[in-house]
Regions:
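A short, compositionally biased
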Residues: 4-6, 102-106, 190-191
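Aromatic/basic-lined ligand-recognition segments
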Residues: 124-246
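Short, highly charged C-terminal tails/helix-capping segments
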Residues: 111-131
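Short, extreme N-terminal segment that most often corresponds to the first beta-strand
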Residues: 2-53, 142-169, 294-301
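Short, flexible helical or helix-coil boundary motifs
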Residues: 37, 41, 105, 145, ...
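Acidic, low-complexity cytosolic segments
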Residues: 90-115
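Short, intrinsically disordered low-complexity segments
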Residues: 28-89, 218, 243, 252
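Extended, charged low-complexity segments
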Residues: 233-301
Length: 301
């Protein structure tokens, strides 16, 4: 699971003269404090008039955020939680928002590192040190030769030893990490979702992904259950993975062309038709129905 740690900041709301707190700002009012701020996990296109509440919103700015940060309002306090390690952009946006909230409420900003900041001091917060601290934890995966998934605003990113080396070989590891995360977040491609099924006797579990014709798609190169799926599976294993190929999507006459053993399809996918975007996932270029049939023929031979 791609969470290490985080830092949490809180800003007390204004008190009312007769006791209690002023009304919490609405999503719309919050988003007006920082240019371009919106909520990645909101159902609405635009920030709504709903007051901020206990529900955690993932806040950020399109193309500037890589992981976003958590924002909610509880017990008269605005709470901002920034993941470790976050991107440079995530930190800049979070600190700007905290500064604005502090200025507006007249309250200091309290951090769970036991320090207190005013609206000016917070802008000088040494976030690079926090990113570096988080990146140090990445070195563990290098020693254990593992792949670690770090959550992003649009999709998770898989890091392995090679990528960790690249981060630390860079003049600014924090900026390099930010760049690696960002490249994957804003790719113009569909992220395929995993589906798990059991056979009718309930003995075997198999996993499936779908690839549609003419659609650039991000797929795992060698699938394994996501941590969410693994939690649901417990000790049970996925016995096989298949790729379902769908055609006729463009003329709303979508139908399954065929399904194929996942590994066999990937092994026969021409090299110029995909590239790795991180340690585990590939971007598959748009394939026509004919190209799909050709790959299927080889994969099933």
């Amino acid at each position: 699971k791609g969470e290490f740690m985080s830092l949490t900041f809180s800003v007390k709301n204004k008190k009312k003269l007769l006791g209690g707190y002023a009304k919490a700002l609405s999503e719309r009012e919050i988003s007006a404090l920082v240019e371009g701020l919106f909520f990645f996990n909101s159902e609405q296109e635009e920030p709504s008039a709903n007051e901020l509440g206990a529900d955690v919103m993932i806040a950020g700015v399109w193309k500037k955020s890589v992981r976003g940060f958590e924002l909610n309002y509880e017990d008269g306090e605005y709470i901002v939680r920034v993941y470790t390690p976050s991107g440079v952009g995530d930190w800049q946006i979070a600190l700007e928002l905290l500064s604005k909230l502090s200025a507006q409420t007249g309250s200091k900003i309290e951090c769970d590192n036991e320090k207190i900041y005013d609206s000016e001091q917070i802008l000088k917060f040494d976030y690079e040190a926090d990113i570096m601290w988080g990146l140090e934890a990445l070195k563990d995966i290098k020693e254990k030769n593992q792949t670690l998934y770090i959550s992003g605003v649009e999709r998770d990113v898989a890091f392995d030893a090679v990528m960790v080396d690249e981060i630390f070989a860079s003049a600014s590891p924090a900026a390099k990490f930010d760049e690696m995360m960002r490249q994957v977040q804003y790719l113009d491609a569909y992220s395929a979702r995993e589906h798990l099924y059991q056979d009718k006797d309930g003995n075997e579990i198999f996993g499936a992904y779908t690839l549609s014709e003419n659609l650039p798609t991000i797929l795992p190169y060698a699938p394994s259950p996501s941590w969410q799926a693994q939690e649901a599976l417990g000790d049970r294993k996925v016995s096989r993975w298949v790729l379902t190929l769908v055609v006729g999507v463009d003329d709303s006459d979508a139908q399954v062309l065929d399904e194929c053993e996942y590994g066999a399809f990937m092994a026969n996918l021409p090299k110029e038709k995909y590239h790795f975007i991180d340690a585990a996932n590939v971007l598959v270029e748009p394939l026509s129905e004919d190209e799909m049939k050709e790959i299927l023929q080889k994969a099933k031979a």
